[in-house]
Amino acid sequence: MDIINDYNKLLCKIIRNNHRGIVVLSGKDYFDILSNLLKIYYEKIKNFKDKIKTLYISEDFNGDYLYRFEKLEEKIDFLDIEIIKYKDSKRILGKTYDILILDMYKSLTPDYIGRIIETLSGIGIAFFLIKDFEHFEENYTTFHEHLLTPPYKLEDVKKYFEYRFKNKLLQYDNIIIYDTEKGLIKRINDECILEEAYPPGRKKILLPDDRKFSDRIYKLCLTQDQVNVLSLLENLLNDEKSIYLIIADRGRGKSASLGLAISGISEILLNSKKVYDIGITSPEFTNVETLFEFLKLGLNKNNIKYKEISQMKIVINNKIYIEYRKPSEILGKKYDILFVDEAAGIGINILLEYIKKYDKIIFSSTIHGYEGAGRSFSVKFLKYLNSLKDFKIYKYNMIEPIRYNEQDPIENWLYDTLLLDSESSEVNESDKELIKNKDARFYKIPMKEWFYNDDPKLKNFVGIYILAHYQNRPNDIAMLADAPHHDAFVLELSNGKIVNGIHIAYEGGIDEDTIDKMLKDYKPKGNIIPDIIVKHYRIKEFAKLKGLRIVRIATIPEIQGMGLGSLSLDKLYNWAKENNYDWIGSSFGITYELLNFWQKNNFVLVHLSPEKNKVSGEYSGIVIKPINEGSEKMVKKLNYEFRWRLINQISDVYFDLPPELILKMLETPYKFKPHYKLNLTDNQIERLEGYLSSPMTYEAAADVVKLLYIYYLLYTEKDKPKIDKEELLIGKFLLSWSFAKISDYFKIKKFEARKVIKRDIKIIYNWLFK
């Protein structure tokens, strides 16, 4: 068997360096070969490890999947095998395995691969079981099946990502590729004698001399970085207002360090007379499962008894209360210390609310890795933190892996393959001159060319998203590479630097039968904008139109505000018009700044989700820019209906929106007259005039005044008069705020608020009735 010699060299290398390896087995009859390789691994590694943890991952455990697993299982009874489906891979976050066996006959979902490979320990091997390596990129996977949306079929899938995946396996060290019929495709070239291989000792860890946490806690650390983070977080015991920013690549023990720190803090706080509340939040509870695991480990090591109320709440001696809540919910309680893990995945507005409310906050975030945020979070957020005058700011960057040694070829392979290490172009003053002169070209990415040729521009493009957007997952890039209904455009300076990127999805063009199903409860994959328009506004014809949904638009942060986003949108509009599309649109978490950007570029708000996103704390909105007369009529109708619904739903559904944002949402480029006449009774007119001429209070005519203002909002013709401080009227009439709340929010006295309202209503009254 010509693989054994190379396999022994691979084992030798990973043992010596505490690195990891991959063995790709191509072909159907791999069972004897794989069982032999596993036996060799077991016999050698059992000398270094007490227990060899093995994980088998498959798409399912029935039919052919089950047959392959059971046939292998009967040959390797010397290993205890844990089994899991790819879709459940979140369950293994924080765990560590020595052997990974991935059934990849029909599976290649990038997010899952990222999660799974990152659980592999040093001196560990991942086995990829592939049907046919030579024709790997021709294979259809379940990822492709999930991508499809009407009217596309499986044969429309592009499969460029699969080519990249295959190509990268051929490029990196510590990877063997073996075909059961053709033999070795990729070998290990370095000479290394397995019998002489022994693991390197771990670097010596130095504990701080003046440490406050117990040695029992510190000795749970695996790296110097973890020790340094614990030492840094001892400062939480000081009286100062403080913020900590801890950033790391994946697999650096960040969450474990936070858990150990909380256990160390708890031990010391138990000696105080005060009751303490410690809050923990993250985009999902799964992000902090490792934190809780190490919190409990630290408490147990310190012999501290605790009560586990739920997996999200721990109480220590009725004195220290530690709990997890979702990002938007945690603001409901005052905490002595707040831990925010994977902070980059939480809306910036919520993070700013934390800073207003809490005196001691720990923000941590992954920089690369499948849930990475890129450099932007640490760079931009740290810049903001440093501007705060009343907080002491601490920062630490964790770089040492806990599962394996640095310079691991498999980590390098993973980051490169999934484009996790992408960086955008650096910009300088000469670039800014080109931008000022609009010396740039806009074009659709030649996706196949970039993926097949490993063009550096691909990483520059992806790097913009990593730099400018908080949440980036490998699936997003694979979707762009493979999905038939996704494409991307870039704005490239004349010197070749990419400065802006737009990821789009083709939507609409839906047939009558599918539309009828959508009117009930059918939700077609993709087609986000047509689906919402059909379901919420019952306008069937819109789904027949063809449009482009902007999935993401991003500019390199240093040159934001120079008009590049607007320039790209203008160019995209022209491209869509030339190619006979009916509209371009987008769906995004609404903030004042973002909505202003879209409205400035002539996009019209037509929908607002009825619920906030629990992670970002924002309502999702849909904006559309019509391209032709037919779509213009529909968008105008949608905009009127949306404005009517918003006005009448605010006090019930959107009561937590700020007045300024509501006013922004009600802006429209269209001229409307309300669909009804304002017919007031004689009594209503009498009370209104009594209020405006002063003998009666606002309260005596509040119902009529509100009717007037709503009519005024709906009316957008040219003869509409302007009124001052309209946000105040929004607060009173649409949000139903008391004068006390208006006074507090707008920082004016109550009698002044009453004067403003009366003055503005008088303007509206004179316009309507005089």
Would you name each region that the model predicts?
Residues 93-100, 105-199:
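N-terminal accessory nucleic-acid engagement/regulatory domains that precede
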Residues 2-59, 240-260:
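Glycine-rich P-loop/Walker A and Walker A-like loops and their local beta1-loop-alpha1 context
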Residues 485-505, 510-513:
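Conserved beta-hairpin
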Residues 258-260, 552, 558-576:
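Conserved acetyl-CoA-binding loop-helix of GNAT-fold acetyltransferases
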Residues 300-318, 325-328, 337, 349, ...:
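Terminal substrate-recognition subdomain of acyl/acetyltransferases
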Residues 59, 65-96, 283-331:
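Inter-Walker segment of RecA-like/P-loop motor cores
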Residues 155-202, 209-224, 383-427:
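Conserved coupling/interface region of RecA-like P-loop/ASCE motor cores
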Residues 2-11, 218-242:
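N-terminal pre-P-loop "Q-motif" helix
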